[in-house]
Amino acid sequence: GVFNQLILHQKEDFRMRARTKKPPLDPVNAALSFLYAIMTTAYTSALESVGLDSCYGFYHALRSGRSSLSCDLIEETRCIAERIVLTQINLKILTRKDFEFQESGAVLLNADGRKKILTAWQERKRSIMTHPYLNEKIETGLLPYAQSALLAKYIRGEIEEYPCFLMK
């Protein structure tokens, strides 16, 4: 797929055949799953802070233990997680040594790998961006709260349509 074409270094160690989760079956999927879990927590907190129930989504079906609305909003920002993972791989910050390969076929980030991804995530959250709808400069880490607040305004009839976040 396209993701593999964006991997410029360490191609043999970071080949992704398909999206796999629970468990991830390759290093790329392990890193993405870890970041998506972090993002889910951020969106769940943001949604609940604006009075929305994160369990009831529009696109993702209601399922026990899943924050479906968080998953819906993460769809808009998957590119942030993907870019972090690609950058870590292409700069050779993340290497094969940062993963545990289990007999079952599951692949997980080890402590060093988690630290590298968390460090990159924290740096990205501090970066400044101009929100396309609000036309204000915000830290990327505030994006879950901005989008959650906009969704709440839409649901309450305060704005006519929900402004989907599009990265430029």
Stretches found by the model and what they are:
Residues G1-K168:
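Active-site helix-to-loop segments that bind/position phosphate- or nucleotide-bearing substrates
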